UniProtKB/Swiss-Prot annotation:
Alphabetized UniProt keyword annotations: Ribonucleoprotein, Ribosomal protein
InterPro entries per the UniProt record, alphabetical: Ribosomal_uS10 (IPR001848), Ribosomal_uS10_CS (IPR018268), Ribosomal_uS10_dom (IPR027486), Ribosomal_uS10_dom_sf (IPR036838)
Protein name: Small ribosomal subunit protein uS10
SUPFAM superfamilies named among the record's database cross-references: Ribosomal protein S10
Family in the record: Belongs to the universal ribosomal protein uS10 family.
Coiled-coil portions: none
Function: Involved in the binding of tRNA to the ribosomes.
Example GO BP: translation
GO MF term list: structural constituent of ribosome; tRNA binding
PANTHER family: 30S RIBOSOMAL PROTEIN S10 FAMILY MEMBER
Length: 103
């Protein structure tokens, strides 16, 4: 038995939640114990640009990108659990980071 931590990131929270739901369903089918999904704070990156190319610095525009993240801990992962996670087809815009938490 090993402990696995999955960290998922995406710009769109709806796509992220669908991916998390499919992971949770696949892990529960194998009989592993799961903790989460734990929502992490949304990271907001703001960019300020000047609207005109040369003058009018007082005229600016702001853009932001929001990065949503979730953490899932699989407490008692079996080889069957790892196999089902490998076969899972997730959305391409979701970034998945897998870590083994064994000491």
């Amino acid at each position: 038995m090993e402990k696995i931590r999955l960290k998922l990131k995406a710009y769109d929270h709806r796509v992220l939640d669908r991916s998390v739901a499919s992971i949770v369903e696949a892990v529960k089918r194998t009989g592993a114990v799961i903790r989460g999904p734990i929502p992490l704070p949304t990271k907001i990156r703001k960019y300020t640009v000047i609207k005109s190319p040369h003058v009018n610095k007082s005229s600016r525009e702001q853009f932001e990108i929001r990065m949503h993240a979730r953490v899932i801990d699989i407490v008692s992962a079996t080889p069957e659990t790892v196999d089902s996670l490998m076969k899972l087809d997730l959305a391409p815009e979701v970034d998945v980071e897998v870590r083994s938490m064994d000491k």
